[in-house]
Design a protein with these regions (language model features):
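Sec-dependent signal peptide recognition
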Residues: 1-9
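Long alpha-helical scaffolds
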Residues: 3, 70-74, 106, 131, ...
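N-terminal signal peptide c-region/cleavage motif recognized by signal peptidases
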Residues: 12-14
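C-terminal capping/extension segments of zinc metalloprotease domains
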Residues: 17-94, 140-213
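Soluble non-cytosolic domains of exported or imported proteins
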Residues: 33, 37-41, 95-100, 122-129
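Solvent-exposed, polar/charged alpha-helical surfaces in well-ordered, non-transmembrane soluble domains
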Residues: 44, 48, 103, 129-133, ...
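Short alpha-helix carrying the canonical HExxH Zn2+-binding catalytic motif
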Residues: 97-110
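Catalytic Zn2+-binding segment of zinc metalloproteases
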Residues: 109-124, 137-144
Length: 213
């Protein structure tokens, strides 16, 4: 069953995996009623579709904290509940739209369903790179996102990542030339993350800028 289509939380809960290594705060939060309706519709559809992908003894919930200025999102595994938390700074970011919001939720889900490589040998969370790959290879396609919407969403979401981590904005027409000598279990460079999303969408090999085999 679906625990809840929309849960607003005003306090932080235990963190297991976040889409960004750090958070910055928006100077001003401006979440309009239209944005809230968009989020409600997106969350309900996401939970309904994603529930079918989870083990039968697990539930999914998206928790929103619209008053918190942090620009970030996190996933927490609470026994049989997979809870995705999205903070207000991310919700109200100018680059956030239905497709980029879906891609963000899919990335967080990817920490649970993305598979190896995992962040630790005894943990359950896929690495950031693997979560990015899963989000594009599987999850957003299940949600009916088309290629044009995906490209815009991938560029928008990684531009937010670049802004928060103070990196150059990633570009579709270039690739990260780095070659990893071992798998990156942390946060790849923003251009590498965009490359990973594109590779996932095209079902191509995971980029060498973070993945080593």
């Amino acid at each position: 069953m679906i625990v809840s289509s929309l849960i607003f939380v005003l306090i932080s809960i235990g963190i297991q995996a976040a889409c960004l290594p750090e958070s910055v705060g928006m100077d001003k939060l401006d979440v309009t009623s239209a944005e809230i309706r968009m989020i409600e519709d997106s969350v309900g559809r996401f939970e309904t579709i994603v529930l079918k992908k989870l083990p039968t003894d697990h539930d999914i919930a998206v928790r929103l904290d619209p008053l918190n200025p942090r620009v970030n999102a996190e996933v927490v595994k609470e026994n049989g509940l997979v809870a995705i938390v999205v903070w207000g700074g991310m919700i109200s970011h100018p680059k956030m739209n239905p497709a980029s919001f879906y891609l963000l939720l899919c990335h967080e889900l990817g920490h649970f369903l993305g598979g190896p490589p995992l962040k630790s040998r005894t943990g359950w969370s896929s690495t950031e790179g693997q979560s990015d790959y899963y989000s594009a290879a599987s999850c957003v396609k299940d949600l009916g996102i088309d290629e044009g919407q995906f490209m815009d969403a991938a560029l928008a979401l990684t531009a937010i990542y670049a802004e928060v981590t103070r990196q150059a904005p990633p570009k579709l027409e270039t690739c990260d030339q780095a070659v990893a000598t071992r798998t990156n279990y942390g946060y790849p460079a923003t251009q590498c993350r965009l490359d990973t999303l594109l590779a996932g969408w095209n079902e191509a090999p995971r980029p060498k800028c973070w993945f080593f085999e």
